[in-house]
Amino acid sequence: MLLAQINRDSQGMTEFPGGGMEAQHVTLCLTEAVTVADGDNLENMEGVSLQAVTLADGSTAYIQHNSKDGRLIDGQVIQLEDGSAAYVQHVPIPKSTGDSLRLEDGQAVQLEDGTTAFIHHTSKDSYDQSSLQAVQLEDGTTAYIHHAVQVPQPDTILAIQADGTVAGLHTGDATIDPDTISALEQYAAKVSIDGSEGVTSTGLIGENEQEKKMQIVLQGHATRVTPKSQQSGEKAFRCKYDGCGKLYTTAHHLKVHERSHTGDRPYQCEHSGCGKAFATGYGLKSHFRTHTGEKPYRCSEDNCTKSFKTSGDLQKHIRTHTGERPFKCPIEGCGRSFTTSNIRKVHIRTHTGERPYYCTEPGCGRAFASATNYKNHVRIHTGEKPYVCTVPGCDKRFTEYSSLYKHHVVHTHSKPYNCNHCGKTYKQISTLAMHKRTAHNDTEPIEEEQEAFFEPPPGQGDDVLKGSQITYVTGVEGEDIVSTQVATVTQSGLSQQVTLISQDGTQHVNISQADMQAIGNTITMVTQDGTPITVPTHDAVISSAGTHSVAMVTAEGTEGQQVAIVAQDLAAFHAASSEMGHQPHSHHLVTTETRPLTLVATSNGTQIAVQLGEQPSLEEAIRIASRIQQGETPGLDD
């Protein structure tokens, strides 16, 4: 069996350097959906292939050659376009001992950053399953490597994958020059961005829902095989930079690794005003989606509507559903595991104490274990807040993406964090972590998604705050009735109200663990004019039935209006509200169900009734108050 190709009408041109001579033109054929043919003749093999030739200075170049015109003889002298002479040299490929490469499920392979990934196979209906290999890269991306079983002519088919890398290029001691690989990848990346193709969920380039690949045909003398060094996992390519010495299984991975030493970023974003550059073609393609807004990778999990820019981000997200944590901490006695190797790498620094990222601000001297934390810290010095909320009328800015990400759910009302024990959902990851600790005694840290797109769950509508919200209306006659929702926070174990906040976000309270402990038996609330008020209470006042009045104390310590404390039953509240209903601008409770009422307060003649839902824990009260201080308006159930 062999892999055939059908030529498209268009052909792309690129150049490869040829030593000191001018660059040689090479034709790359963008091929449509692959087909399979039997026998010694390759079906539908039209078009121009690449021929390796040795130039006069000893370097290797690649020239156009049509196989129909006959074969070039090894050592033959040919005339190039610039008039110079070149010598034909066939790239030798070792003979196969039989079957083609078959990487077993779970087999370890070395990736470009030096870490180990494992092979796994995925189903592709339109391809010969024995010739497709799936490699899960470190960031979660699944790369599909094609290994041709046999190429009779003898040609070697080199497939440029959707991530811009070249598969099937390196065999034995005779490898294609790394500069050639780089040129091929740059061309593939440019075609991927400039062309009209989309990227399918399979990770291959597709158009009109047909899977496509870019292929190059190189003239050779033998069948495509894989050297035994690769089958045994031996690493044949060593980094020659001083103090490094890392080994890689392919010249391509070594080439990419060397860019970490040289700082070379050959893939430049051509979007107007951007100018960012990347070390790999896949990095450029992923970045380009930040300009287009494209998020083609959607989670297929039921009731999950998240989308992602890369397949790697999607696969990392899927692990939040499956619970898979394939990257284990190697430190003896730790036992922690993680969804990505990068998170594991940062975690390992908690064992070693390594903090490689130092702040260069004079007088600062702080160091960080992760680049993300370092960059976020630097913005404290610069005052930069590059992340802006795009919701109309909001315009809030943040120093780090995670803060914008967390803020975004305030507008969408999504609850993306779910408990893997009981299924409860939460808006904030900190609330989920608190729930897991208190309800399930689970102290395992929760990893946050930083590249997510949220949509409100269907049918949720505008019913945002639940549990602890009430609606009150002014007692003014006519149609000028103002309706406001009030979110409340209670202290666990006590029946009194701790904080009162209106939903419009104009009222703020600064509360901490120490503040909460210092309050003791007091009631803290914020009135409608924004004045914080502390109400001293007594157990007898709160616990006894009936209506009681206490003097409000403002933040400045001056005594103010009277606050009516109502016993926790609806009848008592109705009696109290009836008495106070004769006061000007009184407010009456509007509720659809009977719930305990804890507090009735007056502020400048306005009465406020608070109806409680479920009482949260003390930690949740502190967390909600902290969010309110940041300008958010949470409910108790988020």
Curated annotation (Swiss-Prot):
Cross-link Glycyl lysine isopeptide (Lys-Gly) (interchain with G-Cter in SUMO2), sequence positions: 213, 406
First and last residues of each zinc finger (C2H2-type): 237-261, 267-291, 297-321, 327-351, 357-381, 387-411, 417-440
Keyword check for Transferase: no
SMART domains on file: ZnF_C2H2
Single GO molecular function: RNA polymerase II cis-regulatory region sequence-specific DNA binding
Predominant place of localization: nucleus
Subcellular location: Nucleus
GO biological process: positive regulation of smooth muscle cell proliferation; positive regulation of snRNA transcription by RNA polymerase II; positive regulation of transcription by RNA polymerase II; regulation of DNA-templated transcription
Modified residues annotated as Phosphothreonine in this record: 352
Record's subunit section: Interacts with CHD8. Forms a complex with HCFC1 and ZNF143.
Family: Belongs to the GLI C2H2-type zinc-finger protein family.
The protein's name: Zinc finger protein 143
Organism: Rattus norvegicus
